[in-house]
């Protein structure tokens, strides 16, 4: 399940970029 956590981290990073 470590892969899922990494994917969530990447998605959150992308959302943070678009939020700006």
From Swiss-Prot:
Keyword hit for Signal: no
Secreted listed as a keyword: no
Disulfide feature: none
Pfam families: PSMalpha (PF17063)
InterPro entries registered for this protein in UniProt: PSM_alpha (IPR031429)
BP GO terms, sorted: killing of cells of another organism
Induction section of the entry: Up-regulated by agr.
Keywords: Cytolysis, Formylation, Virulence
Domain of life of the native organism: Bacteria
Residue positions where N-formylmethionine is found in the record: 1
Function field: Peptide which can recruit, activate and subsequently lyse human neutrophils, thus eliminating the main cellular defense against infection. Stimulates the secretion of the chemotactic factor interleukin-8 (IL-8). The ensuing activation process triggers an inflammatory response in the host, thus contributing greatly to virulence. Also possesses hemolytic activity, which may contribute to the development of disease.
Extra facts: Peptide production is higher in most prevalent community-associated MRSA strains than in hospital-associated MRSA strains.
Family statement drawn from the similarity comment of this UniProt entry: Belongs to the phenol-soluble modulin alpha peptides family.
Protein name per UniProt: Phenol-soluble modulin alpha 4 peptide
Species for this entry: Staphylococcus aureus (strain MW2)
């Amino acid at each position: 399940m470590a892969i899922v956590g990494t994917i969530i981290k990447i998605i959150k990073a992308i959302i943070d970029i678009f939020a700006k």
